[in-house]
């Protein structure tokens, strides 16, 4: 129930959820196509002329709504930030069910994937658009806070005995993995960036960071994680298990 509430809450923020592309206002169509092109081609490789051509409008018409690519990137980032802020502040509460935590992480990864151009080369885009540097860093801290909250919950119910310093290190590792997962996979070049399995592989990778801290529950935890991964994806991650797991 918590997961579906989160999905509805997130969807409610988005614009034009039930509106077809043809019904969108020109400004919203520009934003939609810009995001599509940035994700597909990479933001540095797309010009405002490319966007206008894709929309079959004049560059002047595009300029009427956005005075340049900088304004477009800022608008897209603001939308990304607003929605991600809600997601990161609403982690699954009071639930130890693997499915709940799995689908919460799926929502996190799916939202990042929808704006993956921001993550393709983080340092470059922050250098090019200084106005998003501070809020982007804030999001990274929020990822750490969300991860820390989940780890503290596990300790509170006695699943793990990890101390505060260990929780801080684990939360940082989780935030690091989430932030650079798409970039890492893109560098491997083994599959198209839109592959859904990429998201489930990312979730499994994050959960594998938590498993070593669960003591006797480690094997059961990862067995459940692998079972969910096999059910929802195509098991693209090598089926290696943590030490002590089944052969």
Give residue ranges: language-model regions.
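Amphipathic alpha-helical packing segments from all-alpha helical-bundle domains
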Residues: 131-157, 165-183, 200-212
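Short, basic, alpha-helical segments at the C-terminal edge of helix-turn-helix-like DNA-binding modules
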Residues: 78-84
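C-terminal peripheral helix-coil segments that are non-catalytic and often amphipathic
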Residues: 4-18, 183, 187-247
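Short, Lys/Arg-enriched anionic-surface-contact patches
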Residues: 18-27
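Secondary-structure edge/capping motif, primarily at the C-terminal ends of alpha-helices
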Residues: 88-91, 119-126, 154-158, 185-189
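Helix-turn-helix
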Residues: 29, 37-71, 75
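N-terminal positioning helix adjacent to the helix-turn-helix/winged-helix DNA-binding module
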Residues: 26-33, 170
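Hydrophobic alpha-helical connector segments
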Residues: 75, 89-117, 134
